Amino acid sequence: MNRKPIPTRIALAAAIALLQLGAAHAQTAPATTDQSAPAQPQANDGLKLDQVVVTGTSTKLSKMKQSVSISTLDPEQIEHSGATSTAELLRLIPGVRSESSGGEGNANVTVRGVPISAGGSRYVQFQEDGLPVLLFGDIAFGTADQFVRADYNIDRLEVIRGGSASTLATNSPGGIINFISKTGEEAGGAFGLTVGANPREFRLDADYGGRLGPKTTFHVGGFQRIGEGGRPTGFNAENGGQIRANVTQQLDNGYVRLYLKALDDRTPTFLPVPVTVSNGQINTIPGIDPRTAFFITPSLARDVTLNKDGGFTTSNPHDGLRVKSTAVGAEGSFKLGDGWTVDEKFRKSVNSGRFMGLFPSDNGANGTATSFTGVLFNTSLDNFDNLFNEIKLNKALTLGDGKATVTGGLFNGVQNVAETWFWNTYKFTLNGIGAQVVNAAGAPTSAPIGDGFTTFGGCCVRSWDVQYTQLAPFVAATYEIAGLNLDASLRRDIQKASGYTVSGNATTRTWDPATQKIVNYKVSHTSYSIGANYALTRDLSLFARTSEGVSFSADRLLYGNPLDGSVPISLNKVTQTEGGAKWRSGSLNVFATLFNARTDESNFEVTTQKFTSNKYSANGLELETSWYVGSFHVAGGGTYTNAKITASNDPTTEGKKPRRQADFTWQLTPGYSIGNVDIGAAIIGTTKSFGDDQNTITMPGFTVVNPYVSYQFNPKTSIMLAANNVFNALGYTEIEGDGHAARAVNGRTWRATLKYQF
């Protein structure tokens, strides 16, 4: 079937038109404020409660005035976090559950007891500068975080939980994670050289921004790296980088900005490793350390798979997670007079890649054998291109003694999802480092013991090419009077899907036309959010909100019920109620939120080949604090979650805790400055959780400590030594339901960074 490409010419024409519109309005008046230039917080405002929020809200107000739970991280906090991936960085945010054990991508991310029933971030949208990275967060082997890299380009990270995320973005009823770029408003830049040992790593970061003219700013930055990755892989499993740039033209009535992004990166994929379970407790197998084990060794350098065209392709498993993304975009904001403003954003991205990682299909006879069997998840991300556009029209007016804002907007998106699966089966020696591929007799080889036509009973020789079109009109209204802020919003999401799926035939050893199924359906839903914030004083605000939203599924539906429009399409719905307080006294800041989240979902899980239908309920408390005293500062947070499965197509799980959901998670980031020396740490912990919905396997609680020490040679030059998981904690984040394989966070690593700022 021929797929319709996303119209690049239309995207470029829109960019040119936007620039021409901006040029027509260019004068010499002062520049207006845009999303990348928020109000500056006070020096003692550790939680940045006075900072203007632009993510998941209809009006640009400070955190203190918004009726949402939102956290921000600035470049210094990111640098001191010790995080080696986006997923690790998100563990610093209260309310966010980020399973950061998969490497640079393919992370499992959710919020507030909303379940992780498969992979990815089904209920949370990843954004770059206010537009989604991908339309769906839980595409198997192609999650949104795979296409995001944290580097010197980031001005700040905004993370909203619950709130109006359900109505001001698509597929985001749980929250929004927005990476906001520097735009050159502050002139300067930096070079950073990072060297890692055990495992080996070399990375160069650079950025620079400033003025091209009185009303024109720019910023450009990126990174390049090579090394083993987060574990001792024995080869350069990490190899690639990105460059991002933007230029902004300020106008008398707004601004116009153009964006560019080019990402080409290879990183290792860390999947579960063989373990055993005894009396509900996880045990390691001699020779396999879950913190360092990696089975894609030099003995496995070639894998032959069926491609989407029916031929065979040879790929190198050493490439691990390979992603390519080229994106161009534009945004503008214009004051039209008489209280009217219009905001426009669009981005066209060309995305592709390949996911390769080894998944154990057994544990070597409970560790008593000399080898185990593993399936090489070799999945081609054939086409993940997308085009997103959002336009908003705002009207500010006076109503009585108060101020009101009415917003109407339209989001339009096109997302291609095309993948090809072909998973060969290999046998490996039971060695966590330096494992050898062997044949059925145990002799060294490089060949599989079974091809994709027989793996998992031949279920998973699959290819599909589906295009999803999203249309979402939305409206929002706010009213502010005497310290009271009220807001309400509605969103109507309409999704159309068209394309096909096909499966392989073991006899003909190619795609079987008889298995081809047409995808052609339409699904829609209306979401709402209502909130209020009341400022009792300048330093104390109370807020409350109720909201409901949905996340539409993409590939998770493809091999279940018919998708030709003949049967209803299942939705994943989240309803949240929350209330809390924001308070500060001197340099002490506190942000506390009580929440209730109810989830109704259907799901397909790749590794178990099971369809599930569950309902969940979670009550809890988020707490975020910050305190400065002299040269000492500390920020921290904690999340208590009481979650349970309230209904299920498997009645044995009803009333049980959702798998991998801990009762309590916490973060602590203390720091101390003395002269030219800064010392500190990012400390992240969790209590125990269950690895399965039947609550028979316990994953112990653990704490990861990431300390750092930095020395400032002069105002421009510094060096920092940092460790990740310095105490080498063994922290499991997931386990298969039968207990044969589990995944853990990486073991201890060290890095040193020499940085020059100018």
Task: For the regions a language model picked out, list residue spans one by one.
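Short strand-turn segments of transmembrane beta-barrel domains in outer membranes
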Residues: I176, I180-R211, G221-T233, A682
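Short acidic/polar hinge/loop motifs at secondary-structure boundaries
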Residues: P132-R161
